[in-house]
């Protein structure tokens, strides 16, 4: 991961961010720092601080991380997530922490992720959300959710409150045959696991950032229909009651006006599965806003 950050072309140059990117995105209502691992960027603290100083009040700023960050980055995130950081600036700040399976991470690194998660949640219970990649019907999804639930219980989450775990199916990438994907035929099996986990953990909710494939619920039983209320899509929209599906006009596909991805060179893409299809470069526009995104 450190090699990726230090490889030319793999991470955004700070001067390019400051001079060419930030002036064009600072009025956007939502900015996410993604990776790789953004917290390993040698100028991460400068990048985050300059974004906070230039963003408009009532906008949203997010950090996508695997939790394996240096102490100086964690210290800044703890300051930012607290009342004297983003809250004082009236910016809604959140950390999205990708929770790995043990086949993808060492015991030592897994403990570091737990340490980071607990520190951020202690500072602000709404400042962090766990994220799971759905890539196989054989993955240890039950173990992942048990570990996350244990963290919330250790921190004393009140019994009348719920927490959301972001889930992201491994979709195919257009033009790339190498990436690992969750086959559509396995969606019902993974969905069955998710239903069982909702039954086991009453405070758990699942959140799909974008579309919700209905076949995830192919194996649901009628007495389990109320559990669907704890599944969200398009960010925070609850999946409608299954009994209303036959009589309602539903759209469960891609969200409108999804954020535009910008790579280290400033090339722009509409969303991750289409990142091989370049739409333009950020330097083509004086400002990135809703109109420029629609134009692209």
Region roles according to the model:
Residues 253-257:
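Short, small/polar residue-rich loop motifs at catalytic or cofactor-binding pockets
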Residues 14-34, 41-183:
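Radical SAM/AdoMet-radical enzyme domain recognition
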Residues 188-244, 267-296:
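C-terminal accessory region of radical SAM enzymes
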Residues 1-12, 271-275:
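Canonical Radical SAM [4Fe-4S] cluster-binding loop centered on the CxxxCxxC motif
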Residues 179, 251, 276-279:
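Generic secondary-structure boundary/loop-capping signal
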Residues 38-40, 270:
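Proline-centered helix-kink/hinge sites
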Residues 262-263:
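Short, acidic, Ser/Thr-enriched surface-loop or helix-capping motifs
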Residues 245-249:
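Short, P/G- and charge-enriched loop/turn segments at secondary-structure junctions
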């Amino acid at each position: 991961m450190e090699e990726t950050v230090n490889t030319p072309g793999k991470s955004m140059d700070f001067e390019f961010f400051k001079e060419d990117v930030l002036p064009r995105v600072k009025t956007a209502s939502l900015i996410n720092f993604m990776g790789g691992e953004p917290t390993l960027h040698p100028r991460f603290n400068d990048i985050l601080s300059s974004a906070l100083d230039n963003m408009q009040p009532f906008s949203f700023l997010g950090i996508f991380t695997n939790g394996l960050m240096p102490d100086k980055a964690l210290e800044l995130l703890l300051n930012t997530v607290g009342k004297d950081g983003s809250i004082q600036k009236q910016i809604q700040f959140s950390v999205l922490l990708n929770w790995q399976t043990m086949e993808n991470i060492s015991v030592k690194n897994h403990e570091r992720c737990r340490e980071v998660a607990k520190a951020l949640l202690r500072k602000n219970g709404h400042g962090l959300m766990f994220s799971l990649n759905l890539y196989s019907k054989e993955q240890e999804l039950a173990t992942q959710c048990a570990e996350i639930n244990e963290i919330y219980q250790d921190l004393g989450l009140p019994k009348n409150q719920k927490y959301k775990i972001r889930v992201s199916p491994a979709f195919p990438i257009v033009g790339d045959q190498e990436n690992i994907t969750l086959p559509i035929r396995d969606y019902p099996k993974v969905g069955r696991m998710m239903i069982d986990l909702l039954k086991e953990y009453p405070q758990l909710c699942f959140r799909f950032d974008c579309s919700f494939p209905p076949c995830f619920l192919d194996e649901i039983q009628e007495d389990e229909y109320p559990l669907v209320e704890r599944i969200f899509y398009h960010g925070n929209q609850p999946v409608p009651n299954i009994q209303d599906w036959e009589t309602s006009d539903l759209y469960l596909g891609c969200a409108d006006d999804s954020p535009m991805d910008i790579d280290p060179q400033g090339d722009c893409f509409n969303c991750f599965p289409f990142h091989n299809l370049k739409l333009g470069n950020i330097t083509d526009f004086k400002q990135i806003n809703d109109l420029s995104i629609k134009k692209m």
